[in-house]
């Protein structure tokens, strides 16, 4: 039975993950990390400054991180120092932060890093890749919507979409929203919506004269992300050190 520690335990994803781990038959909830201590589905949440002590005492097999970028970098370094495998679902990293994490991980521990752990989203990315390859001469727009409390924009999932489109349809200027008089150039329009309790909506629109193709994914509950993250957690334990993606977990082509 794999022992799991969850960073960001008091957050929306942390609570969903904690409940699902506690209810599972093959995972054990070893504890949580957050800003303030508290109870956590039969385990305990300890303050972030106590992460090293928790990892040393509980000796978990895997640490799952859904926090914010600067905290996640430190959590990754702590896990690597304690030989704990990683699932990183935090988004909004700078290139420099990604480099710091890669240095900590490579040669030390296995880690799955993904901007979205939903199985459906990973299939959606594959469809976007194929459409981008075949529809290079179409106008492309990306629209994403999330709840009012999501801080990073565009979302990590949308950034992955843009990366895929650059690879398959050719690099284009990214135009974030539109205002005023302008002619369309070699660009991808990117539109961000924040409001209410929207879990996560993503649409890629390919348009040409007389037709439009839309690819969309809509999440209705955070459990789809948590389920994928736990699938990755089960998979990553015992793997060779290095950075993996959900494509590796699911046996898909690179996304």
Swiss-Prot record:
Active site: 146, 150
Molecular-function annotations in GO: 4-hydroxy-tetrahydrodipicolinate reductase; NAD binding; NADP binding; oxidoreductase activity, acting on CH or CH2 groups, NAD or NADP as acceptor
Any one annotated GO CC term: cytoplasm
Record field: catalytic activity: (S)-2,3,4,5-tetrahydrodipicolinate + NAD(+) + H2O = (2S,4S)-4-hydroxy-2,3,4,5-tetrahydrodipicolinate + NADH + H(+); (S)-2,3,4,5-tetrahydrodipicolinate + NADP(+) + H2O = (2S,4S)-4-hydroxy-2,3,4,5-tetrahydrodipicolinate + NADPH + H(+)
Sites where the protein binds NAD(+): 8-13, 89-91, 114-117
Enzyme Commission number(s) of this protein: 1.17.1.8
Keyword Nucleotide-binding: no
List of residues binding (S)-2,3,4,5-tetrahydrodipicolinate: 147, 156-157
Source superkingdom: Archaea
UniProt keywords, alphabetically: Amino-acid biosynthesis, Cytoplasm, Diaminopimelate biosynthesis, Lysine biosynthesis, NAD, NADP, Oxidoreductase
A Pfam short name: DapB_C
Metabolic or biological pathway, per its Swiss-Prot or TrEMBL entry: Amino-acid biosynthesis; L-lysine biosynthesis via DAP pathway; (S)-tetrahydrodipicolinate from L-aspartate: step 4/4
Subcellular localization: Cytoplasm
UniProt record similarity statement: Belongs to the DapB family.
The protein's role, per its UniProt record: Catalyzes the conversion of 4-hydroxy-tetrahydrodipicolinate (HTPA) to tetrahydrodipicolinate.
PANTHER family: 4-HYDROXY-TETRAHYDRODIPICOLINATE REDUCTASE 1, CHLOROPLASTIC-RELATED, DIHYDRODIPICOLINATE REDUCTASE
Protein name: 4-hydroxy-tetrahydrodipicolinate reductase
Source species of the chain: Methanoregula boonei (strain DSM 21154 / JCM 14090 / 6A8)
């Amino acid at each position: 039975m794999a022992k799991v520690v969850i960073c960001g335990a008091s957050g929306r994803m942390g609570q969903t993950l904690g409940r699902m781990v506690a209810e599972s038959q093959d995972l054990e909830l070893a504890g949580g990390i957050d800003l303030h201590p508290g109870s956590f589905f039969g385990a305990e949440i300890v303050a972030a400054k106590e992460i090293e002590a928790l990892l040393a005492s509980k000796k978990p097999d895997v640490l799952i991180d859904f926090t914010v970028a600067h905290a996640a970098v430190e959590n990754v370094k702590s896990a690597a120092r304690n030989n704990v495998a990683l699932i990183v679902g935090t988004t909004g990293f700078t290139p420099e932060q990604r480099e710091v994490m890669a240095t900590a991980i490579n040669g030390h521990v296995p880690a799955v890093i993904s901007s979205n752990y939903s199985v459906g989203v990973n299939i959606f990315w594959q469809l976007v890749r194929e459409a981008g390859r075949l529809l290079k001469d179409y106008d492309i727009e990306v629209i994403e919507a999330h709840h009012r409390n999501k801080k990073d924009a565009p979302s990590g999932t949308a950034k992955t979409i843009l990366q895929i489109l650059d690879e398959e349809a050719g690099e284009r200027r990214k135009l974030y929203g539109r205002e005023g008089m302008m002619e369309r150039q070699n660009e991808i329009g990117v539109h961000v919506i924040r409001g209410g309790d929207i879990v996560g909506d993503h649409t890629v629109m390919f348009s040409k004269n007389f037709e439009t193709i839309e690819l969309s994914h809509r999440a209705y509950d955070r459990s789809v992300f948590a389920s994928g993250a736990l699938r990755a957690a089960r998979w990553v334990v015992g793997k060779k050190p290095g950075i993996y993606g959900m494509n590796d977990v699911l046996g898909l082509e690179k996304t």
